[in-house]
């Protein structure tokens, strides 16, 4: 088969044919039926967002999952193969706004006022379901075996009930809280965001020093001169219209510095440790006083935007606590001035300080990020656009001490990429801080792969976790199941559809749909006062959706049987038992603050448990230079492009073997091509085996391996040992979820052990005539090997493994798919570790011999006379001398602990001898040269050489001399790990004759290939060349005819009138003309 045919055979046509076969035979049902009584393996699929096409990262993720699941299935496990889809939230909403309804939606209010919530929600649902279909087909094309007809989707009512159940449990346990707090806020999406929904990027922002004039020092412990002021630093000028306080550190020293700023004299207060900033705002200054930070508490100042923001004047006049200095331990001496501008409506620490001293969480910024009427002069301006205007006003008022810019990391919305702001708003929270200790305990019980994924990275995230803001002011999501009484404020948290139906005064018409706007219309009757209760309009953070997947995907609480079977292991354990929950999950390392976290939080809140037992964390996909893939860089690789070009199996094997899963993958097209070549090597090995076996009508049942045991050669026994060692190695890797080790071990076996070693060794044996037992032994060994190899390969390259199984391995009543076979067990009777180690030495010796050939300019096809292998234990290689002779293409192999014909010699090191022996150095150097062999042998044997020169004792070691060796003429040496080879590289006339015969054979075989002849087709050959080559061909004519399948061989005997192919070859500057005629 040519290279073009090979690529086609291994590509789309083969894979689609195999996939059609799986579908027609209903492979999924048969696999599940086969394992119906096996042990449970609850695999939980982390749901990708149904918002686009798959990318390289999602492909890698699903391939890892599929490899693990296929392995577990072959081990007899009942694997839960349900795929999942994340269908709600901003990932979908933003796409619908931008791609579906872009003509109608410019901002959030357009959704309600122009489009309508009902239409918007319906479009979001359509969008999600459409992309579920698209991505399902793409995952199927990758060969992923899952129950694609029965996925869990977060938009299903049954799933939503699972989330509602968790919220009800949180309410019952006092872990659901409504509060006004500072939250991350996306002004474009107009909703709160959780900490794990904020992405940080480097941005450039203003960096300004602002003067806050002191108005009154009567309530402080300092007596300040006129024109005293606090100097503050900020990178968010837009927060100054909300300033209500300044914080200082109580225990740090502060200084009062007289300085001139823009022509006006000020007495500026800054922290002593940060007084270097004074040189930034003024050319010269003088320290006139100092005092501890606590002495400044109570100072009252006038905010710098006093005239521009009337609301600040109003608050200043109404509340004596406003615009004063307060002490706070969190004030840092790392940057700024030590005087921190505090806006309780815009910062978490500011907010807590305000709560402590009684300041209101004043926030003059609307949901869309523009200033409200309370923003005074800046009303209607978007906050970041207001920065420039505010800085300009401060400059005109003489209160801008210095302005610059700074590059720093700033939070952005994870979906629309807009810079966030911090706002004080009323939100709903899961009180994670109250169950944090329990969450940390569960982290210790989970098996993390790698270990540091949980015990370092994830643990650190949980230790610093704050209460989880779970409410969103959006539309397409799981509605917050909280109803509030219009009169008395009583709250009801609903945990299921049946509970909602039971408590509803009335239900909207049509089938229940637990989404907005249907659920918004459900009214309850207050059990406390009898008034109406209406639902709080928020929806849930989409991370709550996936966070409840371990039970919601099972239909719990509606379907308790599935929950008991999978989550509770057929009722053998309670929800908080260490064995309960999903057995295995795997996602990218960004999920330490995403899905791993949301599941743990929801699990502890709902069941006092972590809902997963084993976590494999994988990395990100980057380009070859380690850069993140992005459209702007033009380095995005579409996995479907790889599949189209090289096939799904190539992509699968590549991503599984390229690196340890927890490391970031640096995608390389060259490595993809290398992997495809390895698949070709596997295919060629299979084709070779199948072709010759069929030609000889070999039947493994008629010629079982056991019956041919006495005819097995060392290389046969070695391959039988290697395939069983491979079973152990691959099994161990899968058991530890180190799928990369399994993929790499298989890659090495296919490319090195099977193809480049064993088949190379036995190729001549398959050409033996008749039912020669040595040939039959090869076929039996290869059949045994492929029977095990295709099963080991099945989880990684399922299509090619299936094709080889069906076309070559399967026989009689064997299962109709390799994926219905059992995982192979180690066959100990064939395992021979000593033989494997010995063969490894032989391979290294052969590689060393090849290096000698290359250095000497002798081609591998040209035979050599002798090779000596110098090793510590020569006896262990005795049975493999013939193997080494064949591979190294030498007539004779000798073994020993030392090559007897080498002569060790010592070369003096003058730079070492001179300083030590001084005046005697010249005599020592001459002595070494005169007795080079004697000195060398003594040092090699005893580690030193002793003599007496001019009456002085001389002791020499390898420090003083360099020990080398002289070899007889014609010999070359090369070291390898474990020994050294010596090769006699001179060619005598007999060897040259044989070499020329081989060169001719090679050219005729290339011509057979060009004619696309089958193995059994016979030919006639004519050769014209010089006398030396002609004599060589004549001398080895039987060999030439046998190797080329030639009925006739004519050397310098005329030329045929008609030929099928004629070529003139240049070999070693000699001309060989060859004609081939296909026999009739």
Curated annotation (Swiss-Prot):
The residue numbers the entry assigns to motif 'HIGH' region are 48-58
**Binding sites annotated in the UniProt record for ATP:** 631
Q: Which domain of life is it from?
A: Archaea
**'KMSKS' region: where is this motif?**
628-632
Q: Name one GO cellular component term.
A: cytosol
Q: Where in the cell is it found?
A: Cytoplasm
Which InterPro entries does this chain map to? aa-tRNA-synth_I_CS (IPR001412), aa-tRNA-synth_Ia (IPR002300), Anticodon_Ile_ABEc (IPR033709), Ile-tRNA-ligase (IPR002301), Ile-tRNA-ligase_type2 (IPR023586), Ile-tRNA_ligase (IPR050081), M/V/L/I-tRNA-synth_anticd-bd (IPR013155), Rossmann-like_a/b/a_fold (IPR014729)
Q: Recall the GO molecular function terms of this protein's record.
A: aminoacyl-tRNA deacylase activity; ATP binding; isoleucine-tRNA ligase activity; tRNA binding; zinc ion binding
This enzyme's EC code(s): 6.1.1.5
Does the record's keyword annotation contain Nucleotide-binding?
yes
Identify which cofactors the protein needs according to its UniProt entry: Zn(2+)
One of the Pfam families matching this protein, by short name: tRNA-synt_1
GO BP term, example: isoleucyl-tRNA aminoacylation
Question: Which keywords has UniProt assigned to this entry?
Answer: Aminoacyl-tRNA synthetase, ATP-binding, Cytoplasm, Ligase, Metal-binding, Nucleotide-binding, Protein biosynthesis, Zinc
Q: Which reaction does it catalyse?
A: tRNA(Ile) + L-isoleucine + ATP = L-isoleucyl-tRNA(Ile) + AMP + diphosphate
The record's note on quaternary structure and interaction partners says: Monomer.
Q: What is known of its domains?
A: IleRS has two distinct active sites: one for aminoacylation and one for editing. The misactivated valine is translocated from the active site to the editing site, which sterically excludes the correctly activated isoleucine. The single editing site contains two valyl binding pockets, one specific for each substrate (Val-AMP or Val-tRNA(Ile)).
Task of the protein = Catalyzes the attachment of isoleucine to tRNA(Ile). As IleRS can inadvertently accommodate and process structurally similar amino acids such as valine, to avoid such errors it has two additional distinct tRNA(Ile)-dependent editing activities. One activity is designated as 'pretransfer' editing and involves the hydrolysis of activated Val-AMP. The other activity is designated 'posttransfer' editing and involves deacylation of mischarged Val-tRNA(Ile).
Q: Can you tell me which family this protein belongs to?
A: Belongs to the class-I aminoacyl-tRNA synthetase family. IleS type 2 subfamily.
Q: What is the official name of this protein in its record? A: Isoleucine--tRNA ligase
